[in-house]
Design a protein with these regions (language model features):
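Secondary-structure end/capping motifs
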Residues: 221-303
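Short, glycine-/small- and polar/acidic-enriched structural segments
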Residues: 30-161, 167-172, 176-182, 198-205
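Small-molecule pocket liners
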Residues: 106-112, 207-211, 215-216, 291
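Sec/Tat signal peptide C-region and signal peptidase I cleavage site
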Residues: 23-29
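Pocket-lining segment of extracytoplasmic ligand-binding domains
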Residues: 88-89, 165-256
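Conserved C-terminal helix/tail region of periplasmic/extracytoplasmic solute-binding proteins
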Residues: 292-329
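Cleavable N-terminal signal peptides
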Residues: 16-17, 27, 54
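Bacterial N-terminal signal peptides
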Residues: 11-23
């Protein structure tokens, strides 16, 4: 177990684990410590496969799964991790941390949902408690944005990492209002048709998950970072072209060995739907501008979107080099 996991063991969920396999011919002497503020699920299979491909190219990737995106971000800020997964815009602005996003992994694709025994529409959630993924996450931003749009205020927000966990909590009656991903939506519709209502969201274009790192790390480990970015982009494009490719990648790299039959059956449907919105060019300046529009409205960022500078939040060096090499889609 690496130092990051030891230092914050108390915050790591019971299912947390490390993937640390040294690849031959490593590109640098030090491992690349990646902190992911979630559990490993079907939704992260393509990322896990891309990390395995980076290992094959000589990058010693060490992945640690943590309780929340907030913990992952703090691990990067404190130097306990090199790279984090999330969208830490509020942290970047308020803490003035020398951290920059260098690649977009996914855009927001979520579904606010309520138990119809208690609620029917957004107005019904005024003064009620909701559950989201984690503090500062895209799920929280969406729910706060919709509260503002509908003139309501929640009584409290519970942080429940993992869309699958929130879906299960709905089915068990432990949560009455939350936000789930496309897999959760299908599960709810299949297992309890008519019991849950999906609230209207409108069009949302913003980063859900991205890779971010300390600026010194990005400069000192440029070769490793470029290998990682290329591995992710090529994997994303392969999956977008053929969602069934994720099944073969899971088998090849022996990923999620403890997945249930239901989870395995969900792989192709999930990625068939996700393929349409996967960022095949890693985001970049246009994605940053979309994020400024969304996260200023949701309250995660302060100021006017037009006044925010991309370079204060993103480092596009590695992404630009890789897309110049492999082209854009």
């Amino acid at each position: 177990m690496n130092q990051l996991a030891r230092n914050i063991r108390a915050s790591v969920s019971a299912v947390a684990f490390c993937l640390a396999v040294a690849a031959p011919g490593v590109a640098s002497a030090d491992p690349m410590r990646v902190a992911f503020g979630d559990i490993a699920t079907v939704e992260s299979l393509h990322l896990l496969a891309a990390l395995e491909r980076a290992k094959e190219k000589g990058v010693d990737v060490q992945m640690t799964f943590l309780k929340s995106e907030d913990i992952a971000a703090q691990a990067v800020v404190s130097g306990q991790a090199d790279i984090g997964v999330g969208a830490p815009y509020a942290l970047l602005q308020k803490a003035k941390a020398p951290i920059r996003i260098f690649m977009q992994l996914s855009t927001l694709q979520f579904y606010p949902v309520v138990n119809t025994d208690f609620y029917k529409e957004w107005k019904d959630l005024d003064g009620q408690e909701i559950a989201v993924h984690s503090r500062g996450s895209g799920t929280e931003a969406i729910m706060q944005l919709m509260a503002d749009k509908n003139g309501i205020e929640y009584s409290g927000i519970s942080y429940v990492p993992g869309a699958e966990v929130r879906t299960g909590a709905l089915l068990q009656g432990n949560v009455k209002a939350t936000i789930v991903d496309s897999s959760g939506k299908r599960v709810l519709e299949d297992k309890a048709p008519g019991k849950f209502a999906f609230l209207p969201l409108g069009e949302v274009a913003a980063t859900d998950e991205a890779l971010f790192a300390n600026t010194d790390y990005l400069s000192a480990n440029a070769a490793d970072v470029e290998i990682l970015v290329e591995a992710i982009l090529t994997t994303w494009r392969e999956v977008a072209a053929d969602p069934k490719a994720v099944i073969a990648l899971r088998d090849k790299y022996k990923l999620l060995p403890d997945a249930t039959p239901d989870m395995v059956a969900d792989i192709e449907p999930y990625f068939t739907e996700a393929a349409a919105v996967m960022p095949l060019n890693g985001g970049g300046e246009a994605a940053a501008r979309d994020d400024f529009d969304f996260y200023t409205v949701s309250g995660a960022l302060e100021g006017e979107p037009a006044d925010l500078k991309v370079e204060d939040f993103w480092d596009l060096t590695a992404l630009n080099k890789v897309t110049a090499k492999i082209g854009t889609k």
